[in-house]
Amino acid sequence: VAPSASCAAFVKLYHPRLAKGNHECLTSKKIMDVVEFLHDVVKPTSLKAHFPHIVSVHNSCHGVRELHLSSPSERQEPLFNKIIDLLKLVDGITIREPERKDECCGFGGMFSIEEPDVSKRMGEDKIERHMATGAEYITGPDSSCLMHMQGIAKKENKPIKFIHVVEILAAGL
């Protein structure tokens, strides 16, 4: 069980390609993102968590398009969001989503290194959309996205906090 959607997606989808047919290692078939595991395997109907804050959910590119943690806006599919399903079990929480909810934050692994100015601008735009929801926190299952946006917000003194979704699900335990 991996705590980051982009890491889980890499191992699940790209590790077999790197192994070039050598399948002694079955990691790609066994790895799951923590949200995927909790939602699809554990299937909790209640949690003891208490988090009396307004949160805006960040749907990461890898989480949406590779792990199917939520439905992508560009497809005509029924809407679902495993992250929000789990957060709804938390007492006291107010859940929001930004405009253009599944648009990239600009991190994208090597993209942020190869195109740092574009990456920063995309992150700034995404943070502004999250802040426009009135949220106190931005949350999601992808540590790299959260770290990218948190770094930008800190440099620009933005009054928003960042927290991994699992920290909320475990709040008050």
Named regions from a protein language model:
Residues V1-L173:
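Iron-sulfur cluster-binding electron-transfer modules in prokaryotic oxidoreductases
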